[in-house]
Amino acid sequence: MNIEKIIKDLKLTFYQAGELSIQLRKKGLDKKIKSDNTPVSNGDIEVNKIVTKKIKELTPDIPIVSEETSDNKSNLNLNTFWLVDPIDGTYDYINNLEEFTINAGLIVNKEPAAGIIYAPVKKRLFYSYGTNDAFEDINGSPTKLDSTKNFDKNQIKFVSYSNKLKPEIENLHKKLNVKTFTKMKSSLKFCVIAAGEYDGYVAEPRACEWDIAAGHAILVHAGGSVKDFENNKILYGKKDFKNPSLILKSKSLL
């Protein structure tokens, strides 16, 4: 399996899916609340169709687990599979905010082997397919991600899911000498850490594997790390696809 070629062949599809997501939002989205009490729109569904169709063309024998496909979330004892989140940050998407992303991560032997993330409004595309092979497309050209480039040990900057930190998160920030943090809700947080714009992120158990798989690959391939609070590896294909606690670090903090 040529993972580099697969990811590069997905890039155009992600640009197209991003443009569709914006056009559908301009027309006015059809929105509803799912059984898990989270929002979904026709934009999520249409982007999912485009992305999963292309992935099936490129890797017909690899299963796809998508947030927006309800019939594929039973425990299939998966080792090698795709995790797709067609719109991560649906709240931002349906409320005309900018940080939502389109995501696909390839899992091989329960670990992230490749990832691709596109933030359509910000027009930022990130992807990776192996160690030291993590990139952002800038002006149409792949630019290698460097998570160390803006590091200042006296001004450690984190991203956070919320402006108000829970006590456990606040304590971890203190241990890591975090000076400032910025709210960021989508998988874009993995990308900005991989790009050296921020230094890390801490989260209690929340969300699901499709929310983090692509970003996990990109950050690790850029030299960073993704572990739980006990410093264990994050593995994929768990029975309920739920995430454990997370600590994301740029290479500078390792």
Give the location of each predicted region.
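Oxyanion/phosphate-interacting regions
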Residues: 1-14, 170-175, 191-254
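N-terminal subdomain of lithium-sensitive/metallo-dependent phosphomonoesterases centered on the IMPase/IPPase/PAP
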Residues: 1-87, 171-174, 191
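Residue-level signal for inorganic ion chemistry
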Residues: 21, 44, 55, 90, ...
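Conserved beta-strand segments of alpha/beta enzyme cores
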Residues: 63, 177-180, 225
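Conserved beta-strand termini and adjacent loop/short-helix elements that scaffold enzyme active sites
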Residues: 67, 183-184, 229
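Glycine-rich active-site/cofactor-binding loop and its immediate structural neighborhood
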Residues: 80-121
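Acidic beta-strand-loop-alpha-helix segment within the catalytic core
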Residues: 104-191, 234-235, 239-254
